[in-house]
């Protein structure tokens, strides 16, 4: 990789030297023509001198009169009423056949243009970036194998090309040169055809299923009025979509495996926080907005460090974006300071019919200091479809703990509250009663055994233990109903050779399937 960069640098330097040599050649030619013009001037000078001497020879002393005495102070000058014949007033007699025009003496180069100085700066040519100007950062993705192998410049196309393909390998690069070098090295080692560069608009990737095609938003064509209305110079901004395509289990498993296998090489826009069962994404500046949106929908984000223009979160829900904008403009004095979004979320839950539960989020906004990314490690991914419920229970317990910790914070400002999302920030003043009621209402609506979209006895047991430590009480209608059924079944006069069918079912559901150990 370093040899390629050195060769490219040498190529640019040689091109600059070639331009310099061309400029020297043009200047040498121009100097040669100027010397010829000077020789022609020297040839004409004796003729002028002869004409001047002949005019002086015809002068007689009687024709010269003295200048009148000046009565006013000042420099003496010739009388404008007296005719004066001086050498400068004599017209030169030209004996050559070709007439010399004054313009010929003013243009010694005879129409040869002087080479202009090159305006290119060596620093700009070599580096390609002007100081003080920020250019949009474009990442490149190499899909090494599979039916859609190639080099992409869009994360969405890359995900569509690799999602659901077994054994596919892909990697992210910061420049097209690095991506091309890696792709060529792979194809050379595998003795396969060279991978093509596939821009965003030319990627022909069909939806994976008919259901995905139905849920994908169609492109709307702009209809312009042609009678008396002038067409605007630019297309109108896209309207806010009231719904987004639901995340599928395949999408979640793809992002889950991507986070587990990410080792931090080749991408400085994100890093992962790795635990025993799950890896969460931490997105930095210039991260792919589409990937941020998908990871947000999957509940796999821990922190976001957006740019000043908030381009990384432009695809998040509109109310969340508006809350972040209001925080930047109203809650901090220096609007140019970096901020962070710390997210605690559950993960989706699916059934045979489809998506059952969308993630719930508690988001904290604050002013960010220097970001020190943790080292991303490639972790082993052994999760199966049947393990997703257990993982959802663990993330649900962690979500409840984070939500209950808000009771210990006395200075909180609620930026936004929705049915499944709470956005808050720290405040210099004590929490007002309105914000306190909003937090309590959100806690009462979310903290229950139905947190994951279905009644989970393990969640109920965790809530009960947590609330008892705080000195409170918690009761679940479903769990109390199950206990009543168990008690009634124990007093039933049924057969004594075995438990009733309802007893075994209820006891199996009532046993917690996970521990209360916190998973960061």
Swiss-Prot record:
It holds the Pfam family Cauli_VI. Residues 32-51, 487-520 are annotated as: Disordered. Gene3D superfamilies: Ribonuclease H1, N-terminal domain. InterPro entries: Ribosomal_bL9/RNase_H1_N, RNase_H1_N, RNase_H1_N_sf. Residues 40-51 have a biased composition (Basic and acidic residues). GO terms for biological process: regulation of translation. One of its GO terms (cellular component) is host cell cytoplasm. The keyword RNA-binding does not apply. Keywords: Host cytoplasm, Translation regulation. It is found in: Host cytoplasm. It comes from the Viruses. The inclusion bodies are the site of viral DNA synthesis, virion assembly and accumulation in the infected cell. Enhances the ribosomal termination-reinitiation event leading to the translation of major open reading frames on the polycistronic viral RNAs. Belongs to the caulimoviridae viroplasmin family. This is Transactivator/viroplasmin protein.
């Amino acid at each position: 990789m370093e040899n390629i960069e050195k060769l490219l640098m040498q190529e640019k330097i040689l091109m600059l030297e070639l331009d310099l040599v061309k400029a020297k050649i043009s200047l040498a030619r121009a100097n040669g023509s100027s010397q010829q013009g000077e020789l022609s001037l020297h040839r004409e000078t004796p003729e002028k001198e002869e004409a001047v001497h002949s005019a002086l020879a015809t002068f007689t002393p009687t024709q010269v009169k003295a200048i009148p005495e000046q009565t006013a102070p000042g420099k003496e000058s010739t009388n404008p009423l007296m005719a004066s014949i001086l050498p400068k007033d004599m017209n030169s007699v030209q004996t050559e056949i070709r007439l010399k025009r004054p313009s010929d003496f003013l243009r010694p180069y005879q129409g040869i243009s002087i080479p202009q100085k090159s305006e290119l700066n060596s620093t700009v040519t070599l580096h390609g970036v002007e100081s003080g100007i920020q250019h949009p950062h474009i990442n490149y993705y190499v899909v090494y194998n599979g039916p859609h192998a190639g080099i992409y410049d869009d994360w969405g196309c890359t995900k569509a090309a690799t999602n659901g393909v077994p054994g596919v390998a892909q990697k992210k690069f910061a420049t097209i040169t690095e991506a091309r070098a890696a792709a060529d090295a792979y194809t050379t080692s595998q003795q396969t055809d060279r991978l093509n560069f596939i821009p965003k608009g030319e990627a022909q990737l069909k939806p994976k299923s008919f259901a995905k095609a139905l849920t994908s938003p169609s492109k709307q064509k702009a209809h312009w009025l042609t009678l008396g209305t002038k067409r605007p110079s630019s297309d109108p901004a896209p309207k806010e979509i009231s719904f987004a395509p639901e995340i599928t289990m395949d999408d979640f498993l793809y992002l889950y495996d991507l986070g587990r296998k990410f080792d931090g090489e080749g991408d400085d826009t994100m890093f992962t926080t790795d635990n025993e069962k799950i890896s969460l994404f931490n997105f930095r500046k210039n991260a792919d907005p589409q990937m941020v949106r998908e990871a947000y929908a999957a509940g796999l984000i821990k922190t976001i460090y957006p740019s000043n223009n908030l381009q990384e979160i432009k695809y998040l829900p509109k109310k969340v974006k508006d809350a972040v904008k209001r925080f930047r403009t109203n809650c901090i004095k220096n609007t140019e300071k970096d901020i962070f979004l710390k997210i605690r979320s559950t993960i989706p839950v699916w059934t045979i019919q489809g998506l059952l539960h969308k993630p719930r989020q508690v988001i904290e906004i604050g002013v960010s200091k220097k970001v020190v990314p943790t080292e991303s490690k490639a972790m082993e991914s052994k999760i199966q479809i049947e393990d997703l419920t257990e993982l959802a229970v663990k993330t649900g317990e962690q979500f409840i703990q984070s939500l209950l910790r808000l009771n210990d914070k006395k200075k909180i400002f609620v930026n936004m509250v929705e049915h499944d999302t709470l956005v808050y920030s720290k405040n210099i003043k004590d929490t007002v009663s309105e914000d306190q009621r909003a937090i309590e209402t959100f806690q009462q609506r979310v903290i229950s055994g139905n947190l994951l979209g279905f009644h989970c006895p393990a969640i109920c047991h965790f809530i009960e233990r947590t609330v008892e430590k705080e000195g409170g009480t918690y009761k679940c209608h479903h769990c109390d109903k199950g206990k009543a059924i168990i008690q009634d079944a124990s007093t039933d006069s049924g057969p004594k050779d075995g438990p009733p069918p309802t007893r075994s079912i209820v006891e199996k559901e009532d046993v917690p399937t996970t521990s209360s150990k916190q998973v960061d």
